[in-house]
Amino acid sequence: MTLEMRMVELETRQAFQDDAIQALNDVVVEQARVIERLQLQMAELIKRHEEMVGQYGSEGEEAPPPHY
């Protein structure tokens, strides 16, 4: 294998690696967006849950059944 052939091979590999790195970066960016949306949704659900517990009391505070 000549030096020129080795250089071409290395440059080809580098081009494929650059493409792979860009594709992986795109996936990471999209996952970060999804995580951010999920965190916002979770915060909203926690807020709603706390409001409901405040309105109706927690499960431990249930009144006894009517037959008591």
Swiss-Prot record:
InterPro entries: SlyX. Pfam families: SlyX. Belongs to the SlyX family. This is Protein SlyX homolog. The lineage of its organism: Bacteria, Pseudomonadati, Pseudomonadota, Gammaproteobacteria, Pseudomonadales.
